[in-house]
Design a protein with these regions (language model features):
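C-terminal substrate-binding subdomain of Rossmann-fold SDR/epimerase-dehydratase oxidoreductases
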Residues: 3-124
C-alpha cells in the first residue's frame, strides 16, 4: 500500500506481538524436521517460529525505514483497535527443532528482501 498510496492506517494499535518467520526459513525448518525427527506424527502440532517476538509497531518502523531509503517517506499510523484476531494468544514454538535448525533470516533482513522484490514490481 505504501508504494501506491503513501501513508496508511494500521488495523490495530500495533502493540500486539507476533513471532514472524521468513518463508525460506520456514521451508528449511520443514525439510529439517522431515529429515531428522522420525518420531513426528501427522497429528502432532507443529509450531515453527523465529523464537523472537516482535510488535507490529516494530514491523511498521522497519517498513517505514525501507521507504525512507528509497526517498519515499511514508507514515504508518496506528489504529485505535486492540488485537481482536489472536487476542494476544501465543503459539509456543516446538523447541526440539532447535537441535537441528534455527532461523537464519532476522526480521530486518527478511523485510528488506521482500521490499527489494516489491521495489522491482513498482519500478524503484
Amino acid at each position: 500500500k505504501g508504494f501506491e498510496e503513501g501513508d496508511f492506517e494500521m488495523m490495530t494499535d500495533g502493540t500486539e506481538e507476533r513471532q514472524f518467520l521468513y518463508a525460506e526459513d520456514c521451508c528449511e525448518a520443514l525439510e529439517t524436521i522431515m529429515e531428522n525427527y522420525t518420531d513426528f506424527k501427522p497429528e502432532d502440532p507443529l509450531h515453527i517460529t523465529s523464537f523472537h517476538a516482535t510488535s507490529i509497531k516494530e514491523v511498521a518502523a522497519i517498513i517505514m525505514g525501507q521507504f525512507n531509503l528509497i526517498g519515499k517517506p511514508i507514515k504508518i499510523n496506528p489504529g485505535l483497535a486492540k488485537d481482536s484476531v489472536q487476542m494476544d494468544k501465543r503459539n509456543e514454538a516446538n523447541s526440539y527443532i532447535m537441535d537441528w535448525w534455527l532461523p537464519q533470516t532476522n526480521m530486518q533482513d527478511g523485510i528488506k528482501a521482500v521490499f527489494d522484490e516489491m521495489k522491482k514490481e513498482y519500478g524503484y
